[in-house]
A protein has these predicted regions:
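Short secondary-structure junction motifs
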Residues: 1-4, 94, 123
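Solvent-exposed alpha-helices and their adjacent loops that cap or buttress functional pockets
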Residues: 1, 47-49, 116-118, 147-148
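Short secondary-structure boundary segments
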Residues: 59, 104, 130
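Short, electropositive alpha-helical surface patch
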Residues: 110-122
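C-terminal helix-cap and adjacent tail motif
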Residues: 125-166
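Short hydrophobic/aromatic-enriched beta-strand-loop microsegments
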Residues: 29, 120-126
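Small-aliphatic-rich amphipathic alpha-helix that forms the alpha element of a beta-alpha
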Residues: 55, 63-113
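Glycine/small-residue-rich phosphate/adenosyl-binding loop
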Residues: 1-81
């Protein structure tokens, strides 16, 4: 009952078109970042062109047919595909491969480019392959886009915002 599909991109011209869609989105995202716009634009998304494997992950068009959990939690299909991506990421890392999740794209043009059926939507572009190293901290942290926070900020006891006791 997987509501998702992994699409392996093997056509070089298609890979370039996907890269172009991401490049179209970059200035829009930069504009939304305000004072960090130029810093963001310095980040490259060349992995789409250079990675060993390029995958696009999409939610299927028939996902409403799977009713377990979706009646009360309609977002379970997104949770399911996120778990699938995370599992791939963990497996890749265990095999010594790197993976990057690109989310800078408008879903509709990418769906049209890949011939997704009505109701299906892309949720991720994944760049997978060998990497020169695995830094000891996440790239977003190393580049100053994220700051590590203690687990206690994310784990509550019995109620929201009730910090877990040590």
């Amino acid at each position: 009952m997987q509501p998702w599909r992994f699409i392996r991109i093997t056509d070089a011209a298609l890979r370039r078109r996907i890269h172009a869609l991401v490049e179209q989105e970059r200035p829009r995202t930069a504009a939304a970042l305000g004072e960090r716009a130029q810093e963001f634009l310095a980040l490259k998304v060349e992995g789409i062109l250079e990675c060993a494997e390029l995958l696009v992950v999409a939610l299927g068009d028939d996902r409403d047919k799977h009713v377990f959990g979706r009646r009360t939690l309609p977002q379970m299909d997104l949770a399911s595909v996120s778990c699938a991506i995370q599992n791939l990421w963990l497996a890749a890392r265990a095999e010594g491969l790197g993976m990057g999740w690109v989310s800078l794209f408008e879903p509709r043009p990418l769906a049209e480019l890949l011939g997704l059926p009505d109701g299906a939507e892309p949720v991720a572009i994944l760049c997978l392959g060998p990497v020169p190293e695995f830094p000891d901290r996440p790239a977003l942290e190393l580049d100053g886009w994220a700051t590590p926070r203690p687990l206690a900020e994310f784990v509550c006891e019995n109620r929201w915002a009730q910090p877990q006791l040590p």
